[in-house]
A protein has these predicted regions:
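N-terminal loops that bind phosphate or other acidic moieties
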Residues: 1-210
C-alpha cells in the first residue's frame, strides 16, 4: 500500500477522533434531548484512547491500522456505542484487507462494511432513526458521484452534504432503536444525535482535507 493512501486513512481517523473529543458536550446535549445523554461522553472516552495510543498503533496497512482503532475504542467506550463503533471499524478493516490502494471504490466498500456491521450489531436499519439514516444515503451519494466521474473534491463535498441533509431529516422520524425509542412519538421533532454527530465529524474531515 502506498504511503499516501495510508496517510489519507490516518488523517480521516485522527480528524474523527479529535472532533469526537472536542464536541463531547455538544454531542451529549444532543443525545440528552430524548436519549440518555451519554453519546458525547462515550465517544470522547473512546477516541481519547485512540489519540493517546496514536504513535504506537500498527501501520502495516490500512486494514491493520483500522483493526487497531477498533480494539482501542472498544476497550474504552461503554454502553451500546462501544460495540457499534468497534464493529464498524472492524468491518471497515475487513473491507480494506488486501487493498493496495484506497481509491473511491475502496472507500465505498469500507463504508458499506461499517454500515453493515452496525446494522447487524445494533439490529437496526434505514428508517429506525439512527446514524444509518445519514451514513447509508451519504454512501449511496458518494458511489453515484464516483460512477459519474466526479472529482475527488466533488465526491467528498457531495458526501458530506448528503450526510448532513439526511441527519437533519431524522428530526421528522420516530426513534425505533436505542434509549430514544422509549420516548415514542416524543422523539419526533429532534434529530438523531448519532446521525448529527456523524455529519459534524464528516464535515470536519472534508473541510480540513489536506
Amino acid at each position: 500500500m502506498s504511503t499516501t493512501a495510508l496517510a489519507d486513512v490516518e488523517y480521516v481517523v485522527h480528524s474523527l477522533a479529535q472532533t469526537a473529543v472536542e464536541k463531547e458536550k455538544e454531542f451529549g446535549d444532543l443525545d440528552a434531548v430524548v436519549g440518555d445523554g451519554d453519546l458525547g461522553y462515550s465517544l470522547a472516552r473512546g477516541f481519547e484512547k485512540v489519540l493517546a495510543d496514536w504513535d504506537s498503533l500498527k501501520r502495516d496497512d490500512a486494514a491493520t491500522f483500522l483493526q487497531q482503532i477498533a480494539l482501542a475504542i472498544s476497550s474504552r467506550i461503554g454502553g451500546t456505542s462501544g460495540p457499534l463503533w468497534g464493529t464498524a471499524f472492524l468491518r471497515a478493516s475487513a473491507a480494506a484487507k488486501g487493498a493496495d490502494t484506497i481509491d473511491g471504490a475502496a472507500v465505498v466498500a469500507m463504508l458499506r462494511g461499517a454500515t453493515d456491521g452496525i446494522k447487524a450489531r445494533g439490529n437496526s436499519d434505514l428508517g429506525d432513526k439512527t446514524l444509518l439514516d445519514a451514513l447509508i444515503p451519504g454512501t449511496d451519494e458518494l458511489e453515484r458521484r464516483l460512477a459519474a466521474g466526479a472529482s475527488p473534491e466533488e465526491c467528498r463535498t457531495a458526501f458530506a452534504a448528503k450526510v448532513r441533509e439526511c441527519a437533519d431529516a431524522t428530526s421528522t422520524m420516530e426513534a425505533k432503536r436505542g434509549r430514544a425509542s422509549y420516548s415514542g412519538e416524543r422523539s419526533i421533532g429532534s434529530p438523531d444525535a448519532g446521525a448529527v454527530a456523524v455529519a459534524v465529524i464528516i464535515e470536519r474531515i472534508v473541510a480540513d482535507w489536506p
